[in-house]
Amino acid sequence: MKGKKLSLWMSGLMMMTCLGAMAQQKITGIYLTSADYIQNKMTYTETNGHLYKARLYALAPKDHILLTHGGEQTKLEKDRFFALQLKDGKIFHMKGGESYELLNRNPQLFLYRRKLPVSPKTYPEQSYRYYFSTGENNLQELTTRNIKQAFVAKKDLPERLDAAFRDNDDLMAYDTFHHMYKLEWLIK
């Protein structure tokens, strides 16, 4: 019995250590505004060969991230920056305790995806929910109806959307000829 408790306790300790290590990510930099993102202008970038580490608080979301560099820590409110880029190149926008991966650099229409928790039974399939925003406006779920409402000034857009996409799942189709999402091409 004592051996089981010790084993359980050690497993829990190792899991907490691993989760703590995963919570800190090396970042390439931070985009303070959407204009900075469009122009690829980052702050908090690598200095003297050392990257910043960001504590993202994924398990217990907070309204800030904690940047560590050279033993110094900087607390940065999530609503004070547009996005951060991880070392692996992925770029994330933080909103309301959630992380949304940015998929494009179109100033008229930003496309995002958020990974949804899945059951182990569906392995290895990844499940995502897609969103969009126009500039720095609020995120909305990516649906044809929401796109039509967001771009009311484009009078011919509703008909072009209906002709190009059968349903909401088609909205994330990628155009390999133009090297952009088809939705971006239609909104140009």
How does the language model describe each region?
Residues A150-K188:
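C-terminal partner/receptor-binding element of secreted or periplasmic proteins
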